[in-house]
A protein has these predicted regions:
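C-terminal substrate-recognition "lid" of short-chain dehydrogenase/reductases
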Residues: 84-111, 116
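Short, flexible catalytic-loop segment of classical short-chain dehydrogenase/reductase
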Residues: 18, 52, 56-67
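Conserved catalytic-site region of short-chain dehydrogenase/reductase
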Residues: 17-19, 117
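Active-site helix of classical SDR
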Residues: 30, 38
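A short helix-coil junction within the Rossmann-fold of NAD(P)-dependent oxidoreductases
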Residues: 1-8
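Catalytic Tyr-x(3-8)-Lys segment
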Residues: 70-90
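Residue(s) in the substrate-gating loop at a strand-loop-helix junction
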Residues: 14
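Alpha-helical segment proximal to the catalytic Tyr-Lys
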Residues: 43-47
Length: 117
């Protein structure tokens, strides 16, 4: 990418990197580290026209969350302003946008239905 003077790196972090999760300290710390890495690399690689961004999903309807009971999912939805759990397509649309865009770098984009506000 550096030799070609162009590129796009998209990291995946998590809402827990921003707000922290009880009983998930290590997970939260590593996701916050991904966000810091994203910003640092954006500064370092920007002169080579390489954009670096991160997507921080909230609760998304994936296998990772299959362990949640229906009751737990309903409790979570109550804390989300859009009152729903995200779908993988929500993340995919953001990835597509970041690939096509040519001026966004160093950003951590939260896709969580407003949960982090």
């Amino acid at each position: 990418m550096i030799n070609r003077k162009q590129g796009c790196i998209i990291n995946i972090s998590s809402i827990w990197g921003e707000i922290g999760a009880s009983c998930e300290c290590l997970y939260s710390i590593t996701k916050a580290g991904v966000d810091a890495l994203t910003k640092s690399l954006a500064k370092e690689l920007g002169p080579s026209n390489i954009r670096v961004n991160s997507i921080a999903p909230g609760i998304i309807n994936t296998r990772m969350n299959n362990h949640l009971s229906d009751e737990e999912k309903e409790d979570i939805k109550e804390d989300i302003p859009l009152e729903k759990i995200g779908e993988p397509e929500d993340i995919a649309k953001c990835v597509e946008w970041l690939i096509e865009d040519n001026y966004t770098t160093g950003q951590v984009i939260s896709i969580n239905g407003g949960w982090s506000i």
